[in-house]
Amino acid sequence: MCRMSFKKETPLANAAFWAARRGNLALLKLLLNSGRVDVDCRDSHGTTLLMVAAYAGHIDCVRELVLQGADINLQRESGTTALFFAAQQGHNDVVRFLFGFGASTEFRTKDGGTALLAASQYGHMQVVETLLKHGANIHDQLYDGATALFLAAQGGYLDVIRLLLASGAKVNQPRQDGTAPLWIASQMGHSEVVRVMLLRGADRDAARNDGTTALLKAANKGYNDVIKELLKFSPTLGILKNGTSALHAAVLSGNIKTVALLLEAGADPSLRNKANELPAELTKNERILRLLRSKEGPRKS
C-alpha cells in the first residue's frame, strides 16, 4: 500500500491537507476560496489534495476540489493518481465521479501498478467492475508480470476472480518467475479459488521456474482442501523437474492427512528424489512411516 506524507510548505496548505484527509468540507472550501491555497498544491512526495480526499473516500471534498479545477490525472512521485488511491481503498463512488471528469486508467506506479491492479489486489469487486466498464485493460501487469487475476487469486477474492475471468483474463498467465494464478492460490490455501480456476482451464501442472507445482506447494503447506481439488484433475504425482515429488514434500511437512491423500491418489512411495532419498527416509514419524510402508508392500510384490 502506498503511504502518504503530509509535510507542507505553508500552514494554510497544511490545514487544507488536514481538511481533505478528515473530510472537513467547510474548512476546505474556506481555504480554497481564500485564494491563498492552490487547489493542486503538493507535499514533498507530490501528493495532492485530491489524492488525499480520494484515498479517504470523502466524495464531497473530491467533488469540491474537482469543481474548483483540481487536475484529476496528476501523479505522485510514486506514479499514483487520485483514481489509483480511490480504487485501492474501494471507494467506488469516488471512482465513478472521477471517471465523469476524465480520469485515466493508463497511469502506472513505479512498480507497474494501475488502478485495476490495486482494486483486484484488495478485492474491491464493484470498483473492478467500474474500471473495466471505463476501459481499464484486463491484461495490465505489474513489472514482475503479476496480472489482476494473479493478485486477486493471491488474496482469495472469488467474486473478483469470476468477474476477471468472465471479462477475458488469461487463467494461466504467469509472473516472470513462472508463478501462475493457480500456483499462488494453492500456496495461499484458497481451495475455492483453485476449484474455479481448474474448471476454467487452469493448467494443473503449471510449474514455477524453480520446478515446483501447485500440488507440491499445497502438499508442503498441508492445505488438504486445495489438494483434494487438484487431485480431481489428475495432476502429476511423480518426480518433478525440481527433482522431488509432492509426496516427498508432504512427508517433510509432517501432515499425515496430506500423505494419506496423496497415497490414496496413487503417489508412489518408492520414488527417490534428486538426493536419492525415499519419502520414508525424510521422516521419523512412526505413523507416517507405517502409512508409507503399507503402500510399499503391494508395489513390491
UniProtKB/Swiss-Prot annotation:
SUPFAM superfamilies membership: Ankyrin repeat
Annotated phenotype, changing residue 95 to M: In a breast cancer sample; somatic mutation
Pfam families, per database record: Ank (PF00023), Ank_2 (PF12796), Ank_4 (PF13637)
Source taxon at top rank: Eukaryota
ANK repeats: 11-41, 45-74, 78-107, 111-140, 144-173, 177-206, 210-239, 242-271
SMART domains: ANK
Keyword line: ANK repeat, Repeat
InterPro entries xref list: Ankyrin_rpt (IPR002110), Ankyrin_rpt-contain_sf (IPR036770), Dendritic_Spine_Reg/Scaffold (IPR050889)
Name used for this protein in its record: Ankyrin repeat domain-containing protein 29
Species of provenance: Homo sapiens (Human)
